[in-house]
């Protein structure tokens, strides 16, 4: 069955952590944008793995192709800028970025660690505006479960997403809900990237939700993110 195939894939890739890479030019990018939290290390790392690892190459994205990307979780816009700078060059390519700009539980637990929370949307929109393909990005402000019906109305029942990037709230319920709502919108052969899969709560939410319905073709764990080809 598809479920057992998925479980088999998971056990196969779970412990095979990819090499961590440092990317030249990171400093230059850091000067270009304003990011208080992390940089787009995890995505750069995943990108490197997909382009160099023999298993990863089956999942690698061709930069020049037309694609519809949807990301859940913008925060300061780091991942948004990554997609904009590297994967939106085709004139037809588009990115929809979803975030309520409220921060999530882990931020509210220790607000002193996250001074950017007060100006999150402003910081994010400022960063996105500086990115290479800013004009192809639509930021939808709201919680992913409330944006979902709007996207269903707009796009209909057929799968329409080429790349889904899931980096919203990290509790297992939110992760599972984002997975169950949005993964069916991904085209066959499309990619789903789960950030923070190395985090036990995220892993639990993803595994449970994907086991419930998904027919995944292949998957790879890149050290912190899980990339699944549908």
Residue ranges of model-derived segments:
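A short alpha-helical cap/connector motif
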Residues: 1-230
């Amino acid at each position: 069955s598809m479920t057992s195939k998925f479980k088999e894939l998971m056990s196969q890739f779970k412990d095979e952590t990819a090499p961590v890479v440092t990317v030249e030019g990171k400093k230059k990018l850091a000067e270009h944008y304003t990011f208080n939290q992390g940089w787009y290390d995890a995505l750069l790392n995943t990108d490197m793995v997909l382009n160099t690892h023999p298993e990863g190459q089956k999942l690698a994205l061709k930069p020049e192709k037309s694609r519809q990307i949807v990301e859940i979780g913008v925060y300061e816009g780091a991942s948004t800028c990554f997609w904009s700078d590297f994967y939106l060059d085709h004139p037809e390519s588009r990115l929809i970025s979803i975030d309520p700009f409220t921060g999530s539980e882990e931020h509210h637990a220790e607000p002193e660690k996250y001074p950017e929370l007060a100006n999150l949307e402003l910081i994010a929109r400022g960063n996105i505006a500086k990115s290479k393909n800013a004009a192809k990005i639509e930021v939808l402000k709201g919680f992913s479960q409330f944006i979902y019906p709007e996207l269903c109305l707009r796009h209909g029942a057929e799968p329409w997403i080429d790349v889904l990037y899931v980096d919203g709230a990290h509790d297992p319920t939110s992760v599972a809900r984002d997975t169950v709502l949005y993964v069916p919108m991904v085209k066959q052969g499309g990619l789903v990237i789960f950030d923070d899969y190395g985090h036990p709560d995220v892993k639990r939410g993803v595994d449970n939700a994907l086991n419930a319905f998904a027919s995944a073709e292949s998957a790879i764990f890149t050290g912190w993110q899980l990339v699944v080809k549908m």
